[in-house]
Amino acid sequence: MKLSVNEAQLGFYLGSLSHLSACPGIDPRSSEDQPESLKTGQMMDESDEDFKELCASFFQRVKKHGIKEVSGERKTQKAASNGTQIRSKLKRTKQTATKTKTLQGPAEKKPPSGSQAPRTKKQRVTKWQASEPAHSVNGEGGVLASAPDPPVLRETAQNTQTGNQQEPSPNLSREKTRENVPNSDSQPPPSCLTTAVPSPSKPRTAQLVLQRMQQFKRADPERLRHASEECSLEAAREENVPKDPQEEMMAGNVYGLGPPAPESDAAVALTLQQEFARVGASAHDDSLEEKGLFFCQICQKNLSAMNVTRREQHVNRCLDEAEKTLRPSVPQIPECPICGKPFLTLKSRTSHLKQCAVKMEVGPQLLLQAVRLQTAQPEGSSSPPMFSFSDHSRGLKRRGPTSKKEPRKRRKVDEAPSEDLLVAMALSRSEMEPGAAVPALRLESAFSERIRPEAENKSRKKKPPVSPPLLLVQDSETTGRQIEDRVALLLSEEVELSSTPPLPASRILKEGWERAGQCPPPPERKQSFLWEGSALTGAWAMEDFYTARLVPPLVPQRPAQGLMQEPVPPLVPPEHSELSERRSPALHGTPTAGCGSRGPSPSASQREHQALQDLVDLAREGLSASPWPGSGGLAGSEGTAGLDVVPGGLPLTGFVVPSQDKHPDRGGRTLLSLGLLVADFGAMVNNPHLSDVQFQTDSGEVLYAHKFVLYARCPLLIQYVNNEGFSAVEDGVLTQRVLLGDVSTEAARTFLHYLYTADTGLPPGLSSELSSLAHRFGVSELVHLCEQVPIATDSEGKPWEEKEAENCESRAENFQELLRSMWADEEEEAETLLKSKDHEEDQENVNEAEMEEIYEFAATQRKLLQEERAAGAGEDADWLEGGSPVSGQLLAGVQVQKQWDKVEEMEPLEPGRDEAATTWEKMGQCALPPPQGQHSGARGAEAPEQEAPEEALGHSSCSSPSRDCQAERKEGSLPHSDDAGDYEQLFSSTQGEISEPSQITSEPEEQSGAVRERGLEVSHRLAPWQASPPHPCRFLLGPPQGGSPRGSHHTSGSSLSTPRSRGGTSQVGSPTLLSPAVPSKQKRDRSILTLSKEPGHQKGKERRSVLECRNKGVLMFPEKSPSIDLTQSNPDHSSSRSQKSSSKLNEEDEVILLLDSDEELELEQTKMKSISSDPLEEKKALEISPRSCELFSIIDVDADQEPSQSPPRSEAVLQQEDEGALPENRGSLGRRGAPWLFCDRESSPSEASTTDTSWLVPATPLASRSRDCSSQTQISSLRSGLAVQAVTQHTPRASVGNREGNEVAQKFSVIRPQTPPPQTPSSCLTPVSPGTSDGRRQGHRSPSRPHPGGHPHSSPLAPHPISGDRAHFSRRFLKHSPPGPSFLNQTPAGEVVEVGDSDDEQEVASHQANRSPPLDSDPPIPIDDCCWHMEPLSPIPIDHWNLERTGPLSTSSPSRRMNEAADSRDCRSPGLLDTTPIRGSCTTQRKLQEKSSGAGSLGNSRPSFLNSALWDVWDGEEQRPPETPPPAQMPSAGGAQKPEGLETPKGANRKKNLPPKVPITPMPQYSIMETPVLKKELDRFGVRPLPKRQMVLKLKEIFQYTHQTLDSDSEDESQSSQPLLQAPHCQTLASQTYKPSRAGVHAQQEATTGPGAHRPKGPAKTKGPRHQRKHHESITPPSRSPTKEAPPGLNDDAQIPASQESVATSVDGSDSSLSSQSSSSCEFGAAFESAGEEEGEGEVSASQAAVQAADTDEALRCYIRSKPALYQKVLLYQPFELRELQAELRQNGLRVSSRRLLDFLDTHCITFTTAATRREKLQGRRRQPRGKKKVERN
């Protein structure tokens, strides 16, 4: 019985094992549950029957397998002789038993060796089972009964061993697991049984086993029960089992793998583990192939043919499947479908779902759907008692909270308002709201919200949400309509089915009619079904296509006036009239299509044709995009009346019937025919097909026309074509082309459209132009129509025509007039244009004798003017401050008179000036008499006048700008003053810069004065060039910028084109300008001024005026001191100026100053150029220059001076300019006086025209033109004036300047000392020392000339005539002009050009400057960025124009070009800078200008503008006092000397003309990026992490170098195009870029060395580069400029903080290429400077240093490219050792300082490493004792 007990124990144990393994929920490998399982098995071992059953089932299975798979070799052998098998197995078993015994030791008490062997085998079997995923598919957990035959067991063990051998790793792991967890549920013993394939025993036993197997085949093994068969089983077992004790022991051990019953479960487990270990050890000898067949215990599949791995996989799959089928769903309770939270009880889940649905706003229906989807499958499979029980218990726990929550929800449900309450609420809402639909929507939403809680409650879940009552949803009208629709459906159901689906009627029409008081909607017509119409069954009138339901008819407002209005009622019935009125402009083109009521039904073919035509017309309507009828004129009158006018301003939609106004008498067919005719002819408008004539407008657009139409419709036009036409080849076809000037393309197109179609629908905005065209070509009907065009109002209710007068007329017409004048000059005086070019050059090349005379006269006159203005400045200033137009006019008149007198005085000097003076006087009269409005009108008129005499225009424009500048300066001192604003406006309009200031005011103080000028010019020329964002007109009209009041005052104050530089020029310059057109244009200008007066504009204007005043000096002062103040302030500025050109410049005092500077520079620079070919031309050039000079110098003076100081400067400038001729006028019209002087000079129309024309051509608007061309002259003059003023301020500079400059400087110094105190503090011009005054003056001139090209203000600031002093003044002016970037630009350019002290030096500098324009072109590029359109506008291809591009006014001469390029470039850079710096102090801009001028000479290419160096220079300028001028000088020296070789002025100019440089790829927003992102971005370029701010700057810098704008990198460009200048430019820029000392040093070097003499101060390089670099952020003004003029710079420095702050802001905050480049340029420049310092460059002149830097860069570039390996590393951003590169460079003879090399590498984004150097340093530090380190550090 012991054996049976053991067997039973083993069987139950195995059965429990199998059972547990069948339970997937229990981990079969967990050893913790083993003891309990064993105990349970032992408890169930009480019955022997159970054990017998196990054995029987085991044997049955064994026999079954044996019988089935006897084919195996081993099986065959076993079957052959059981005895042999048994014996052999016994032997093996004995051996194994012995081993087992040895292993077991004392632990196994009972089992003899024989029984241990079977145990071992069984263990092996179990082990194999463990290794195999054991599943008992049959549920025979206890199948593991001991086999009666030990051999069989042994065999099984062997098989198991073989399996273990084959798969030792997995089996061992599983064996271990199962040894540790013998009862592991997951390991079904049946697999072991299957593994064991014992030889068949007795037949009786086999049968019994088979029977037992049938009983125990269950999916889930049940607990074994004691049965009566126990004895029989026992007997059978005894019979089957050999009597041999060993065998018995074997069988017992095999089946009772555990120790005897008494033994504990732990002992059994231990024994099993040991046995399994033995089996594993012995299993290596056997293989399944040798042992026999192998069957899957789960699916009974024969796996004998499989290797161990495949068998394991198969069994694992079977086990997995069995587990899936047997395992209860683990998530008994589904998780929350909303948040995924698991639950233990259903109630907890239910309560959570409710709460979660409320929190997550999930609707009940959606929640139910989710729950159903989620629980559909899991619930079906999950029903475990354990979980249900746990859920139950836990659910009970949660019942309390759940039940508590339910009542809460019930409360909520109770709280839900009743339906009555909801209805009441809805009703109240509906009463409060006008529309019923909206309340309905809100009601529904409210209702749904109320219903939601109900849906959440169980009680209400079943109830569908209740929709709000219809009573609440719809009003009575809607209900009535619905009822009517239902009835209609009942009555006409068939018809409705065939009709277009009804659309809800729109209430827009009804409301629109009510609001507009239009005729009621047309009466209901018979239903028109689109299906019928589209079927083309017959001709349909247009209104028939209009379905009320599709879109109710929209009737435009009835024309308040016009013929159209009258015919409308009679023409068509109400419906038709409304429909016709409703017609969109496009439909107007096809009005004939069935306008009248449908006539008798035509034939089918006719109907089809008509319907098709209607559809075609409708399609045309869709295609027509023009505001006026695109295809026909039938709807002309009606279209005109109702054009673009719809009730509520809503666009016409749907099928809008054409107007039937034209042919009320005719039937639909007649209208249709006419409509077809009109449509067909309308299609030919501007149609190139068969076109035999072309009309080219001022904008360059070409319109195609057909002569036969013109011949039939407009004989005068065809006559004009025949007379004026010329042949043009386009696309290889020779066609006749006619220039149609003074009219916009739109107007010309509309005119042609009328001729082709007789369409009366004329756009209100074009009525004036159309009227002019109609008058011009004798189309009386069109004239009448234009008169009848109703005054349409814009969205603001402002009359369209009024707005057009302000915007389009002032902008487009005035601009077109300028273009016209330019074209007229071009056509009428081709030679004059050529002469103008020559004259410009000649003007630049003014005779030295004349210049000297001018300087002398200016000095004397300025002294006189200073005295006079000092006396009258207060009165004039008060007048101007009064802001009354009368006072402004009076001042203007006084100034005009003074200027006229001065002009007369100067007449002996220049005969041309007499005319100019006369013109000025006339213009003064014209301008003075009209009030502000008249002045603005005058501006408008001036533009047309300019057309007539470009020369006079240019002169008057120039002169006018001068006055404007003075006025603006005065105004600048009193930015609040209206007069100041007007003056500023006038100045801007006159010079274009002021007009641009208007835009600057409104949008862009940032835009430099040059930009303003150019913008004005462009705006004058092109309506599109409405540079001023606030108002294109305003932009065109200088006055709007400053401020409407100022503009008007200035206009009144000065007859010069106050409204516009062009207008001013026309008025002042030529008698024709004084023609009645002037008043009209003045009015327009005035309207523009009013626009500029708009709050935003006014503020901008005031700001700009202040800034401009700083730039222009005088302009700001007009507010402080009227014309007198201006005059007085000019005495300060002008005193020097007047000293130079006191007598000559009286009238064109400013002009003369401008001329002096320009001409001096031109004479000095462009002596190479022929002296002005004609005295008149010279005078014209002088006049023009004086104009610019006056404007700029005045502005500069004011800018330099504080607001209070500016007026005196302005007066000084006026004195300087007007002393000779306009000492008195200077006071009031000093600014204008200079322009008048220009007019006098320009009085000779041909020459002056030529000069101005050349200028105007580049930028048609005189403002723009004056900024470009006349700006060149003007700018040069202004520069001269400014320079003179600067010289006056800084007598030493003046003395160092040209001999004239010295004289002027002395004179000015006499005067300047007065102005300088104010100017010096505020202006950087003063920074230049006396020695550098000339150089600076040259620098100013050179840059200022380029700038003059770009900006009259800026270029005049650095006028050559002013020489050193003027250069200083211009610098100061530029510095003051931070608001007016043009001034800044001018000064730098001027400085660059004026570097040379002597005239020769100046000439050299000017030549260099001319060559430096490429360098200077950079700043001009910014100007062009703002005003680049001007260039394309100029019809005349002029070098000056190109130069203007580079330096807006480079038309004058190479030197002027240089100055202009530099100035324009400086101006542009300031223009860009102005965005930021304009807010800054004027000194900042001046410094910037000086710096940029220096930069310009070095590299005044666009790169410099983009370079942060330029911006930094601007800031540095503010920081740096006189140093700033030296940088300009340095560039002039470098630029003047090298520029010749580097001269690419035209290219640079072209660049300037290009649109603003904008990166093709927008710069990422580095400023707002997170630090990790910035680090990653830097890592891409191999840059180590830096502080966030530095990373931002560095990334921006990298972006600038890696993402090119239209041009290559600014520095690269400047370096490549201007190798010599680039390095200096970079340095200058670097110094400019918050490197005051560096920039100052360069400027000083250039100023000191000039071309040669001004360099002495070059060595005075201060540590500024680094210092400024550090101060790039702080913008501390380093006042270490070697020049002694630094004190004035200091004053500027005081102002610097604001502009610098703005610059810093732009650098920090803006992702613009400018700021990033500025930082990079700054660093680059600093590196160069430091390198230069290291190399002892301090002793080298600025120009030499620039040349060296450029050469060094080029050498480095060439060297890197010559080394393929190094170049590849550079291209791939692979770092290379810096020290190695330095060593290689030294070996190759390239000596480059470390700092310069670093700067070069950083500038070009070349990745390098200094790891070796750092390691060495670290090692050295480690070696050094700490004390030494400290000492070294100290």
Swiss-Prot record:
Taking the record's annotation, the residue ranges forming a coiled coil are 801-870
Q: Where is composition skewed (Low complexity) in this entry?
A: 95-104, 1351-1362, 1706-1730
Task: Map out region (Interaction with SLX1) in residue numbers.
Answer: 1632-1834
Q: Which GO terms describe its biological process?
A: DNA double-strand break processing involved in repair via single-strand annealing; DNA repair; DNA replication; double-strand break repair via homologous recombination; negative regulation of telomere maintenance via telomere lengthening; nucleotide-excision repair; positive regulation of t-circle formation; positive regulation of telomere maintenance
Per UniProt, where does Zn(2+) 2 bind? C336, C339, H352, C356
Q: What is the effect of changing A952M?
A: Requires 2 nucleotide substitutions
GO cellular component, alphabetical, reads: chromatin; chromosome, telomeric region; nucleoplasm; Slx1-Slx4 complex
Keyword Manganese carried by entry = no
Q: Where is this cross-link: Glycyl lysine isopeptide (Lys-Gly) (interchain with G-Cter in SUMO2)?
A: 68, 291, 347, 359, 412, 458, 835, 902, 970, 1081, 1093, 1112, 1120, 1169, 1179-1180, 1575-1576, 1657
Q: Which family does it belong to?
A: Belongs to the SLX4 family.
Name the linked condition.
Answer: Fanconi anemia complementation group P: A disorder affecting all bone marrow elements and resulting in anemia, leukopenia and thrombopenia. It is associated with cardiac, renal and limb malformations, dermal pigmentary changes, and a predisposition to the development of malignancies. At the cellular level it is associated with hypersensitivity to DNA-damaging agents, chromosomal instability (increased chromosome breakage) and defective DNA repair. Some individuals affected by Fanconi anemia of complementation group P have skeletal anomalies.
What biological function has been recorded for the protein in this entry? Regulatory subunit that interacts with and increases the activity of different structure-specific endonucleases. Has several distinct roles in protecting genome stability by resolving diverse forms of deleterious DNA structures originating from replication and recombination intermediates and from DNA damage. Component of the SLX1-SLX4 structure-specific endonuclease that resolves DNA secondary structures generated during DNA repair and recombination. Has endonuclease activity towards branched DNA substrates, introducing single-strand cuts in duplex DNA close to junctions with ss-DNA.
Specify the protein name: Structure-specific endonuclease subunit SLX4
Q: Tell me which species this is from.
A: Homo sapiens
Q: What is the lineage of its organism?
A: Eukaryota, Metazoa, Chordata, Craniata, Vertebrata
